[in-house]
Each structure stands twice: as C-alpha cells, then as structure tokens.
Amino acid sequence: MVKDLKQEIITKYQLHEGDTGSPEVQVAILTQRINHLNEHLKIHKKDYHSGRGLLKMVGARRSLLNYLKKNDIERYRAIIQKLGLRK
C-alpha cells in the first residue's frame, strides 16, 4: 500500500487528530489491503501464499468488527455503512 493512500485513509476515518489505532482506522486500512490483494489474486490464481495472507487479514478485520459491534453498535454501523461491507 502506498504511503500517501494509507495516510489519506487514516485522515478520513480517524476519530481525532493523531488517531491511527482506533478500530475504525484499522478496519479501513485492512479493507483497502484486502481489496488490493483480492485484485492480485484474480490475476494470479495459484498464489496460495498470498491467499493465506488474505484469509488472515479477513479474520483480523472480522475480529475488529466484532469488538466494535460488542462495545459500540453505533460506531459499528457507521463504519459498515461507510465502507459498504454489509448489504
């Protein structure tokens, strides 16, 4: 992921100035990485090593979303809606 793109995502989803570790920011960054890797795997179908990394990232994102859902349902709904993860 390009440094500028990552910084842009952080500024878009941060809760306050200097916030880089909130669940919203982490989920947004993971979503970008997942989408990028998904495009890579459409071209390189036999890249099993990257496929495993993709599954680990999806699991990490799922864990963060579960944490948000359990602790603050409004923030969970907001991030899901912003990123378009659920229908």
From Swiss-Prot:
CDD domains: Ribosomal_S15p_S13e
Top-level division of the source organism's lineage: Bacteria
Protein family: Belongs to the universal ribosomal protein uS15 family.
Gene Ontology biological-process annotations: translation
InterPro entries per record: Ribosomal_uS15 (IPR000589), Ribosomal_uS15_bac-type (IPR005290), uS15_NS1_RNA-bd_sf (IPR009068)
Keyword RNA-binding set for record: yes
Upper lineage: Bacteria, Bacillati, Bacillota, Clostridia, Eubacteriales
Keyword presence, Iron-sulfur: no
Single annotated GO MF: structural constituent of ribosome
Pfam family, one: Ribosomal_S15
Source organism: Ruminiclostridium cellulolyticum (strain ATCC 35319 / DSM 5812 / JCM 6584 / H10) (Clostridium cellulolyticum)
The name this protein goes by in its record: Small ribosomal subunit protein uS15
UniProt KW keywords: Ribonucleoprotein, Ribosomal protein, RNA-binding, rRNA-binding
GO CC annotations on file: cytosolic small ribosomal subunit
Subunit structure: Part of the 30S ribosomal subunit. Forms a bridge to the 50S subunit in the 70S ribosome, contacting the 23S rRNA.
Protein purpose: One of the primary rRNA binding proteins, it binds directly to 16S rRNA where it helps nucleate assembly of the platform of the 30S subunit by binding and bridging several RNA helices of the 16S rRNA. Forms an intersubunit bridge (bridge B4) with the 23S rRNA of the 50S subunit in the ribosome.
Disulfide-bond pairs as recorded: none
SMART domains in alphabetical order: Ribosomal_S15 (SM01387)
